[in-house]
């Protein structure tokens, strides 16, 4: 069996997991997440511990994937996820207009980004954007969409980058 799927998931206090025949539901302080359950993966709840196993050898990797997704769902409804973006460049600014994000990224017009349902955007400063939510995949997708408005370029490093991202710099052309 998969090493990932072998590891049991402990459910923290304040989180409720329900396993139906076709759906997994996780309820917590921050919200509710659901995931369609495959017939090829067995999910057994024993008190506050979840264990997963594959029905046959060909679905071992699926059991590992479902275990990782379930673990992220439990973490999301209890703690939440966030991605931080930094704006690097002269005149690059971010501000909030209600729930929408207004970006000035050197274009002739400002960009207005409307976040999807379940995603919160914050701007602690004019050069920082924080994407928060309970669904890890959606938080990453929204952060990637915002970053793609002006990805960092390798010569000066200008653009929108993740806070943990290191930009590989190139040397300018020599005359």
UniProtKB/Swiss-Prot annotation:
* Similarity section: Belongs to the universal ribosomal protein uL6 family.
Give yes or no: UniProt keyword Protein biosynthesis: no
Task: Identify the coding gene.
Answer: rplF
Q: Give the organism, scientific name.
A: Xylella fastidiosa (strain Temecula1 / ATCC 700964)
Q: What is this protein called?
A: Large ribosomal subunit protein uL6
Q: What does this protein do?
A: This protein binds to the 23S rRNA, and is important in its secondary structure. It is located near the subunit interface in the base of the L7/L12 stalk, and near the tRNA binding site of the peptidyltransferase center.
Q: Which InterPro entries match?
A: Ribosomal_uL6-like, Ribosomal_uL6-like_a/b-dom_sf, Ribosomal_uL6_a/b-dom, Ribosomal_uL6_bac-type, Ribosomal_uL6_CS
Query: Which Gene Ontology BP terms does the record give?
Result: cytoplasmic translation
User: Which GO molecular function terms does the record list?
Assistant: rRNA binding; structural constituent of ribosome
Gene Ontology cellular component annotations, sorted alphabetically: cytosolic large ribosomal subunit
Q: How does it assemble?
A: Part of the 50S ribosomal subunit.
């Amino acid at each position: 069996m998969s090493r990932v799927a072998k590891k049991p998931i402990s459910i923290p206090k304040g989180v409720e997991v329900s396993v139906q025949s076709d759906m997994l539901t996780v309820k917590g302080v921050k919200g509710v997440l659901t995931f369609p359950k495959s017939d090829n993966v067995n999910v057994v709840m024993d008190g506050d511990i979840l264990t997963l196993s594959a029905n046959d050898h060909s679905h071992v990797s699926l059991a590992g994937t479902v275990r990782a997704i379930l673990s992220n769902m439990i973490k999301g409804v209890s703690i939440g996820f966030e991605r931080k973006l930094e704006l690097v460049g002269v005149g690059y600014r971010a501000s909030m207009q209600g729930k929408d994000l207004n970006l000035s990224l050197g274009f002739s017009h400002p960009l207005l980004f409307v976040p999807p349902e379940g995603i919160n955007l914050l701007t602690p400063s004019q050069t920082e954007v924080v994407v928060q939510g309970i669904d890890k995949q959606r938080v990453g997708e929204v952060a990637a969409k915002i970053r793609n408005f002006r990805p960092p370029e390798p010569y000066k490093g200008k653009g929108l980058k993740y806070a943990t991202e290191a930009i590989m710099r190139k040397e300018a052309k020599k005359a």
